[in-house]
Amino acid sequence: ALHAGIDLVLELPFLFATQNAERFSDAAVCILKYMQAQNLVFGSESGELTPLKRIAKILLHPDQAHFKQERSIGYARQMENTLLNTPELIPYIKHPNHILGIQYIRSILAQNAKILPITIQRKGSSYHHSEIVNTGFSSATAIRKLLFEERKVTSKIQTAVPEMTAKILNQVENYIDWNTLFPYLQIKVATNSANCLKQHLLVHEGIENRIKKIIP
């Protein structure tokens, strides 16, 4: 990032960088607030800030009784149900960049941070587009997919990422993907009871039983 022209890079600790959007954004805003940042700029599919602000305010003060009643259906569905009275906002929670942007704004409000949220409309491929495009910007999903398939930096990848990124990727001897890590997860699941798995962060609402059932 520094070689690409960024002035300062702040690390989001691994503990928070690997969490869901809510925890990710809480930690990120906390760091920015401490650094006295004035703006938080994020990409979004629509480039519209007003609807994202409306959703963030609704999520900041949800109907707690409603959430408790619907807990078994999961947080994503709860979020959608919370917006039933404002159906025009529901399409905005269907996109990954919108979801993170909403959580950034919610975190700013929750922490009373003097930070101005700004959004830039995403250009090029959508986040989940799986093919490299010849013009415009390719998605991170497409770049990762091709990198894991080819196991090297091809000319297509070179055209899709900054020069310094391509150089760093060329130095990697072994690209680790989920298939590489899955056997270790299998061992963990096989050697631990459901009650033990339940002690892990965000493993709740019976998901430990489903994990034991579907992972041999």
Which residues does each PLM region occupy?
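Histidine-anchored nucleotide/phosphate-binding helix
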Residues: 2-3, 105
